[in-house]
Amino acid sequence: MPPAGGPRTPRPHALPRSLSRLRECPGRSRIVLALGATQMALGCLIVAVSFAALALTTSARVRHSCPFWAGFSVLLSGLIGVVSWKRPLSLVITFFMLLSAVCVMLNLAGSILSCQNAQLVSSLEGCQLIKFDSVEVCVCCELQHHSSGCSNLGETLKLNPLQENCNAVRLTLKDLLFSVCALNVLSTIVCALATAMCCMQMVSADVLQMFFPHRSHSANAACVTPHGTILHQTLDFDEFIAPLPPPPYYPPEYTCTPTAEAHRGLHLDFASSPFSTLYDVAINSPGILYPAELPPPYEAVVGQTPASQVASVDHQVVDSSSGDPNTAADFSTPVPASSTSLPTSEGATSLGPSHPSPDGTLDTPTPLIPTPVPHHMSPEAASLSAQAQPSPGRVARSVSDPTSCTSSEAVSTSQPAMAACQHQHSSTGDPDTWKTGQGTKPETLQTVSKERPHSLVESKAYADTRVLVAKFLEHAHCSLPTEVRHVVGTIRSMATSEEPRVEEAIFGAGVLDQL
């Protein structure tokens, strides 16, 4: 016998139908339990009353009519019914049904016999106490009207005299026989109900299996076989419905959208420029000021340019308004000459070549002072003279140098545009418009080492701000709104205040690099 908690042997294919139906429905299980218990109680009563009646009489006819055998069969049937409720095996249920059917017939016969004998005892009213060899026996017979004794022709009943009054013993036997008759009738009814229920259960399971093979098991929530028992049924994967998938996850975007920027009143209409091809965005919409994607690494962009780059002189623009004449800022104008050019650098650059020394340091030549441009010359003439002046040499920049310049042509191309803007401001007379300087100031050129520290190269914030300000100055129109001019002026003032610190940091880094 397998253990209570261990696995059990699977059942045959014909068994699960009746078992699962009985196990799945607690109502039918309770009915089977009630019928089994009732049969056990009735069987015990029939056996007890039958033996009591046998003890009161010695007559063979009465003794043979006491249905104690029916009581034993009913008791056994009730016991099988309780077992079928505890262990709902198809074999046990079938045996319970057959035994209940047998009990119906036995109880029916016992009830008939007990009732006949009870009527016989009630008809024998004349009882006498007779002694046979020191043995007392009560003899009951049918009374005759013309005689007071019992005739030998009629029926006689011999009773065991438990007391001197034989009539009391006869009445007790009569009551016991009628009680046995009533108990047999009740047992017949109970056994018939048990037989009908078991038969209907098995037939219904067979019919469901025949007409509905895929729905033979009850779909009621109260009729479910617990997992791990012998009645556990295999899941039907054809009726399995997969759960709904979770909603897709979209990561948050921490960028400024054009819709949000449109509420600020910042409407810029810039012309197309190489800056859009460099950062793969368009610069004619407010959203491009805050690109959703980060710009490409500086090393990747510089890697597309040739190894040796041309050094150029930064163009210095003096911007002053009528309201604040003391405010001045120097900005470079990074207009690339080709698609592979880089933004121009701020500050001073060296025009002489750098020659490495034998010990690994760099030897810087004597800085050259550019020829100042006279004030009476126009910007176009100044640009032509700057182009005609021969360059003493070129500076070999590092690949990772963010201050690399393209050529002097990129600087000279922005001067006619600034002159045109100045001419329009002077003609309109707007006090809030910007004015360009009368000329470029001579600037002392500082020597820069061949290689820059990586800490300066990785400083993307300053480089990006410088490029953004340069693009504002490059594409600035004379008819910009007041708000835009205020924003540009603020950025220029901040960049101007930070220019000396940046130059000192670059110079210090160059000295440390030489050491």
UniProtKB/Swiss-Prot annotation:
Keyword annotations from UniProtKB, A to Z: Membrane, Transmembrane, Transmembrane helix
Subcellular location: Membrane
Keyword Transmembrane helix: yes
Region Disordered, annotated ranges: 312-452
Bias kind Polar residues: ranges: 335-352, 400-416, 423-448
Record field: transmembrane: 31-51, 65-85, 89-109, 176-196
Ranges annotated as biased composition (Low complexity): 357-366, 379-392
PANTHER family: PROTEIN ENTREP2, PROTEIN FAM189A
Protein name according to UniProt: Protein ENTREP2
InterPro entries in alphabetical order: CD20-like (IPR007237), ENTREP1-3 (IPR030431)
Family of this protein: Belongs to the ENTREP family.
Transmembrane helix among keywords: yes
Annotated membrane topology: Multi-pass membrane protein
